[in-house]
């Protein structure tokens, strides 16, 4: 029996690269879609916020001397490309994915309309939110916290390359241990980088828990959905 009925899955753009240095790795995205399909078949309503860092990162563009707002808009367009790739992979897996974008591009995707998104979720469709919040200076983590709050998700599932939040960087400190659960306040006091500060604060204020887990670990998403000991749960 799934532990959650409606979830917001945050996928980083980098996760779509697989072992490649850039772009979208088809086998990687197909594997992600198969994981998503499995939980959809359990009756879980799934919304996805996707990043664009595999194609372009607004922060990096700004740091290189580009106007930050322009760079962020370019990053939003990168998320649109990823969202369309994810939707296409879902079609091949016989799942109906609908892309809703915070930036209008009506010939390609639907605009973000909250009641429509909720209706599509209730119909068993996977809703993919593209273009972040539609505003520069806000990350796709913040978009995940915002959309998760708007659609009434029970939890934000932050899919990363590590299997949770650790006491220290496990790559640098072999003695680092994974937190099974941790409170928002404790994560702040220990300066643990779960999400960026704006996203983290929004989740805390809305009492929206976050589960950090590895998207690269086989069956991890299903284990999270079933309430098993996978990743790290950040709670109020």
Swiss-Prot record:
Record text on activity regulation: Inhibited by UTP.
SUPFAM superfamilies tied to this protein: Carbamate kinase-like (SSF53633)
**Pathway annotation:** Pyrimidine metabolism; CTP biosynthesis via de novo pathway; UDP from UMP (UMPK route): step 1/1
Q: Where does UMP bind?
A: 52, 72, 133-140
Residues binding ATP:
10-13, 53, 57, 160, 166, 169
- Enzyme's top EC category: transferase
Q: Which GO terms describe its cellular component?
A: cytosol
Q: What is its EC number?
A: 2.7.4.22
Q: Which family does it belong to?
A: Belongs to the UMP kinase family.
| UniProt protein name | Uridylate kinase
Lineage of this protein's species?
Bacteria, Pseudomonadati, Pseudomonadota, Betaproteobacteria, Burkholderiales
